Every structure is written in structure tokens, then in C-alpha cells.
Amino acid sequence: MTADRLNLGCGTDVRPGFVNLDSAALPGVDVVHDLNVLPLPFEDESFAEVVCQDVLEHLDYAPLLGEIHRVLRPGGRVWIRSPHFTSRAVYLDPTHRTAFSVDTLRFFVRGDAFAERSYYFPFHFSRLESARITFHRYRAMPWNYAVEALVNRSPAAQAYYEGTFLGRLFPASNVEVTLVK
């Protein structure tokens, strides 16, 4: 395992060029590890990139974010996708413990306005590189293409969407965030 990219909680989404970690010994999984058991089985600053797709909503995510921060190299990036709080998927899966706003992970970014109580955690990412709200793209819901484009025009548009009736009228699918160590 010499890859410098980690696919955390990969499930069946095994990615070439990544260390693929999951709690189940599925085909292609390189490391079997329960993400509820920390620390992660890697040295400090082992990875330049971490993919964390559809994982955090199943766990007590703050300690795992701390571990992701530990195994990332300085300047390394973590890409996170989790269900948006307006998504019905939040409620369909009994293993989901939490849902996310586009701003939830800003709590862990040094100097961010949302990080006013960041003293509860011993780690902080240096910056938020990107944050998007995604929507289901089905032929039966063609308006979602336009809604997604409008909602993601700016952080103010995202806040307006989440804080008004629009979030209930046009439920989102996921939040996608990239944090930099």
C-alpha cells in the first residue's frame, strides 16, 4: 500500500490508486477497519487526499474528522459527501445518525465565522476550498438542474436556500465539501 490517497468507507466504490478502507471485507478493499474504532491504522500525515463519500452521517463524525486531519499531509485535501438535511435519504436509512448543512463542516475551519466554539476540538483545517449543495437529477425533476445552479451561485444563495421555504419546496440530495489541512 504505497498510495497517498485514501478512500475512507469505500464499500463497493473501490478506486484504483487509493488505499480503499471499509469495515467489510469486500472485494478490492485494502484495509478492513471499523471507523467507530479510532485511531485509524495509518501514520500521521500519510495521505495527500482523502475521499469520504457517504460515511460521516453514519458515525460520531467529529472524532473521525480529527483522525482524517491527523493522517492528511499539510496542504492535503479531504472531499466529503453527506446527505443534506432536506434529503429524504436522511430518514430512509436507519443507520444515518446525522444530516448536514452546507455550513456544518465550516465549524472545523480555523478563523471561520462558524468556528466560534472550535475550542472543543484540538484540530482545525486551514480552509474550506469548496462547498456545494447537490440535487437529484432525474428526468422527472428537470427543475433541479436550474435550482442547483442558482443555489450554488454564492454562499449567500446557499444560506437563503437553507433558511427559507425553498429548502422544503426543492429538497436537496447531498452536501459536498472540500477541506484543506
Predicted regions and their residues:
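Conserved SAM-binding loop
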Residues: A3-T86, L179
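S-adenosyl-L-methionine-dependent methyltransferase catalytic module, highlighting the catalytic core
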Residues: D60-E67, R73, R77-K181
